[in-house]
């Protein structure tokens, strides 16, 4: 029923609510329902986090398990487009990694650096992109102060987080849910 509302133009967004992920995704991914396009489909979640001054997007925690660089660019573009649809004029996206420095033993940091560089030279998404950056630096100006890290959007300026993979994103959102209930 919700899919029909979206495909006929009477609705703009699907919300999962308390449905199991499989039950939510199966009709979404079914090509005959008409939601899929030529673009890579990814999931964007908006969350209210204690101590964070605005809603924060997180992607992708549901569809792309371990995105390659091309898929990561599509996820960034999808997230930026979703935020723009919600009224964010120039979304600021953080490419989350375990650490904020490029480390050749951590491929996610290298990929984040490459994506930020590519976005500066040949923009592929309508957003500002920063990374690699660890989660504590995304959320906390105090963490930046303690680590002597300079980021203009830390502590409330980021509009979204692009996680390294589905496991990182899913773990992060579940921790948000648990802490929000306490």
Enumerate the predicted regions with their spans:
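Anion-binding alpha/beta catalytic cores of soluble intermediary-metabolism enzymes, centered on
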Residues: 1-154, 159-164, 168-182
């Amino acid at each position: 029923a919700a899919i029909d509302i979206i495909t006929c133009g009477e609705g703009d967004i699907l919300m999962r609510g308390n449905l199991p992920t499989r039950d939510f995704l199966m009709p979404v991914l079914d090509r005959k329902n008409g939601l899929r396009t030529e673009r890579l489909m990814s999931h964007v979640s908006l969350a209210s986090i204690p101590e964070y001054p605005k809603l924060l997007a997180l992607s992708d925690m549901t569809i792309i398990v371990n995105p390659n660089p091309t898929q990561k660019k599509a996820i960034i573009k999808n997230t930026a487009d979703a935020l723009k649809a919600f009224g964010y004029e120039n979304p600021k996206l953080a490419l989350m990694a375990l650490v904020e420095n490029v480390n050749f033993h951590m491929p996610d940091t290298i990929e984040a650096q490459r994506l930020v560089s590519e976005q500066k030279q040949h923009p592929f998404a309508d957003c500002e992109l920063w990374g690699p950056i660890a989660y504590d630096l995304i959320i906390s100006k105090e963490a930046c102060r303690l680590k002597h890290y300079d980021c203009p959007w830390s502590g409330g300026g980021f509009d979204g987080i692009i996680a390294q993979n589905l496991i990182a994103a899913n773990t992060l959102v579940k921790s948000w849910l648990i802490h929000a209930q306490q």
